[in-house]
Amino acid sequence: MVYILELKTTQAAAMKIVTDAINSLLTDANFDFYPYYIEEGEESDDESKNSDTDNDYESESDDADSDSSNEDSDSEQYIKKKITKKNSKANAKSKPNKNSDKPEEKAGEEKKKTIGGVVLKEVNKTGKILVYMRLDADKFDVYKYNYHKKKLTLGIDIGNLLKCLKCMSHFDTMSWLVDDEDINKLIVVLESVERKEKKTFKLNLMDIEEETYDITPIQFPYSITLPSPDFHKYCKDMAGSTDKIEIKATSKKLFFSGKGEIGNVEFEVGETNGGLQIVSTTSNTNEIVQGLFELKFLLIFTKCTNLCNQVTLFLKNDYPIIVTYQIAALGEIKLVLSPSKAD
């Protein structure tokens, strides 16, 4: 038995939390797995002719300003979707490279290398939300990529994956494996050394049309960081009064407001040590940015609250909002929501 993919982490609880959040937004998705190291300018064999996905990991991991929207929104010009003729299983059906466990650095090698890992990038069925998740290879306890191509794509039913992860205990170790003799299944293993337990699931993989998204990098005026429990509470409290929430930011304050049957509601939050922090990324510190968003989606985003202590928001006039959470020590998830039209 040879595994073309083998990863293991003790951060299993964080993976369950983020999978639960993604399950509320996507029914299924393609997970792209990259080698431990990615060389700058490296292209896959035949795939590079059809898509730019081989550079997805490197470009997206450094891009905090990506955004998405559906085709009917005002921000449609900032994302274009391409559908390839490949599917996830076809992409996996090939011989493993048994010598590419973890690329060895050659003496005198000058090519710049970046850390690879796992990428999920999908727009949900409403067309209003882009989900982007990145898990870094060097943050896993074990990350072995033995596939002969530069990318391995697996189509995974998110609901079925969540069912497996819900069987874990808090301190379980989670492993994902793909056997070269049974490449149509993802093996999920949950282990507890203390209880001497081992639970193994073999998930059927899906044929999902592979989609790529061209996302224009955008500079947002403000990077807004606040405690993730606070953001969850503001959204939850607002939900009792309104269906849509307006988020407005200045260089010093953050405002949440809405209208409903009870009337108008507004929360004003100022900067504090250990609390709200607003960083201006432009020379114009007097700029006011705001956007109107559907609260039900922001509430789904807050399912990620327990992943980290702080959440970061990127806000710009007439643009989608980006809500970013760190996935424990593994990576990050960016949830991008298109603005809503006023009633």
PLM feature spans:
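DNA polymerase sliding clamps and clamp-related checkpoint/processivity subunits
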Residues: 1-241, 246-343
